[in-house]
Amino acid sequence: MDRVSTAHLRWAYPWKTLLQSGVVVAGGSDAPIETCCPFTGMHDAILRQSRDDEEDIFRPEERVDFAEALWMYTIGAAYAANSEHFLGQVYHEYTHVWYVLDCVVTLL
């Protein structure tokens, strides 16, 4: 966060505040600058820890829980892409993309 002034840091990544205000928040990445792995983004939204120091938590009041992070990266992302009527949920009329994982996602 060295590139952002202290005055502006309070507005950085306010996920919890936005969700509580009724804003549709879309999870995503800035690939190729950041990883395109949604689990990394979800992990960061949930824990908000520094990659260098796990004790350094950026604005802990803006943490989201697992369900909120999953919502951001599924339904929220589909909404942002104007595709919420056929993506983002497991529903018989929706387009499905399935991933098989070899771990418990809630532990990521």
Ranges and model annotations:
Residues 1-104:
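His/Asp/Glu-enriched, well-ordered alpha-helical/loop segment
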